[in-house]
Amino acid sequence: MSLESVRAFFAEKAPDIDVLVSSQSSATVALAAQAFGVEPARIAKTLSLRVGERVILIVAAGNARMDNKKVKTKFGGKPKMLGLDEVAGITGHEVGGVCPFGLKSPLPIYCDVSLKAFDIVVPAAGSTHSAVKITPDRMAELTSAEWVDVCEVAT
């Protein structure tokens, strides 16, 4: 799945967007920024969380940190990161390549307002060596994401 499912997602929904593949690892914000030649804040990281019985994905700017209190208020429960052993089974993507595109099964997706500081962001594309360049609004539109304010930007 993963890279292939993301390529299929874009072929169907946005054929004008190219999936970029790097020979360098893009498994972390810092590595992705280096691999794709952008500042770390432009990397759109996808957080895989369990809140109560629900699994949700929150996409945020690379320099943003999840605010547990805001997440608890918004979603009605304490957020817990999915375990490393759960991520691929639930999302279809390996850790370091998790993104809101080409998921194994539909999940609620939320885009944090921290992304709106940028005209173009660079989320992963299903593997630890791939990404796409996309506007935050287009990403939200393609994934049917809801905009939320649940992160704080590091200064």
Residue ranges and their predicted role:
Residues 1-155:
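Extended, low-hydrophobicity, polar/charged segments
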